[in-house]
Each structure stands twice: as C-alpha cells, then as structure tokens.
A protein has these predicted regions:
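Sec-exported extracytoplasmic/periplasmic mature domains
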Residues: 14-21, 55, 98, 125, ...
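Surface-exposed binding/hinge segments that line
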Residues: 22-64
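Ligand-site clamp/hinge motif
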Residues: 2, 98-142
Length: 168
C-alpha cells in the first residue's frame, strides 16, 4: 500500500470537511501543514475537543485517491482489508499482507450486524459468534461469569476536560 504520512492524512481531512458538514463544523480547520509524519492543524477558533472529534467514526483516515467503492468499502490503514460489505448484514475482512506493523495473526474476520438483543445474546452463547458489542442490559447477567470476558462502559465515547484556573 501507499505510505500513510502527514500529506495523506491532510488530503483525507480536506476531503472530509469538504463533503461532511458536521465534520467541518466540529473540526473548525482553517489550514493544515504536512511535514513528513507531522501534521499541524490550525483552527479558526480554539477547539479543545479537536482530538475527540478526530476520533469520531467520520474521522477514519482513508486513501481518498482510492475513494469509496459502490458498496461502501474504503482503503484504510489497519491490519485488515475489507472484501465485502453488505449493509445491515455483514462485513468480511482478510488480513492485510502489507500491514505496516508486520504479521497479522488472524487470517479473516466476519463482522455481523445483529440488531436484536436476544438474537445477539443467543449467538454469543451458542458460539456462533466470538465477540459482541452493544449487548442488551437484560442479558448482562448471562455473561458475567468465568466463561466470558465481559466489559461494560456507560458510553462508547469519552472526553477529557482540563481547566486553566489561572486564565480568565
């Protein structure tokens, strides 16, 4: 694949704010400077949540030269390559032979969309799936035991706030 340097990230973010109204409003990008692996972002105003916004799902860094396929697949920077996307059903991934961080120890992954909470719980219990996200609260007791590794957080997003009490 192509290198993911600051110029590639800059190009991706320029495209993002051009086509995504919310991203443009959130990020408040005035200008950017790319230098090797360092990207400097200048904003139109103070934007203390910039790092949080860059980690939003819309902020995924993709190869904009490759674009988005008709079925929604993009070229990214991760350890897997998408081979098939069927909206509201599944996403098939295979290991990226050119992954920058070396060998990927899983050959393929299928990410299934299971929107019904009971169906999701039953699929996990039966071994049909190996992991789940967005489990219904009512199902928690079933998985809070030694047979499962269960983690729960109140939100999928977190924010860091710092106050400067020395400045008015």
């Amino acid at each position: 694949g192509k290198p993911c340097d600051a110029e590639a990230v800059k190009k991706c973010l320029e495209d993002l704010v051009a086509v995504h109204e919310r991203a443009a409003g959130d990020l408040k990008i005035d200008s950017m400077e790319a230098d090797g692996l360092v990207l400097t972002i200048h904003t139109t105003e103070a934007c203390p949540s910039l790092m949080n916004y860059l980690s939003e799902p819309y902020g995924c860094i993709i190869d904009v030269d490759e674009g988005v396929t008709e079925d929604g697949i993009v070229v990214g920077t991760g350890p897997f390559v998408a081979t098939e996307l069927v909206t509201d059903d599944h996403l098939n991934l295979v290991k990226n032979e050119n992954y920058w961080d070396g060998n990927v120890n899983v050959d393929e992954i299928t990410v299934r969309t299971i929107s019904d909470g009971d169906t999701l719980a039953l699929a996990l219990q039966s071994g049909e799936i190996n992991a789940a996200y967005g489990m219904a609260y009512a199902s928690y007791p079933v998985f809070e035991n030694d047979n499962y590794q269960f983690t729960s957080v109140q939100t999928s997003r977190s924010f860091y706030v710092q106050m400067n009490y020395a400045s008015p």
